[in-house]
Amino acid sequence: MQYTWEDVDNEVKLLRSAWKIGNAGKARTAARRAVGMAIGIWLEKHPRPEYGSSFMNFVETLSWDESAPPNVRGAAERLCGKTSDPRKTAFSIDPMEDAETILDWIRSIQ
């Protein structure tokens, strides 16, 4: 499925709404979806097979992609983190900020 920046912006609205009412889980999910959509848009123009085919694959791959700046990789790593996984120390305590960091970078390289 092809997504547009309008789809990304709509998902960001859901993210902001969920975060505002204190639904952190829904906010993290919306952040991952928004970032996944944006990466998908970027991959249409710049195919990278190693990124896989799902939003979570996209975000996980971005977390270790050396071509991305360290702050973007860190934001992606935190968005991949699960609060219920004690082995993983990095998880997003501010999914809005992490999503915005990644989305701003993707928009800048379009």
Q: Residue locations for each model-derived region?
A:
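Heptad-repeat amphipathic alpha-helical coiled-coil interaction surface used
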Residues: 12-16, 27, 34, 103
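Helix-centric, low-specificity signal for extended rod-like, repetitive segments
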Residues: 9, 21, 25-26, 66, ...
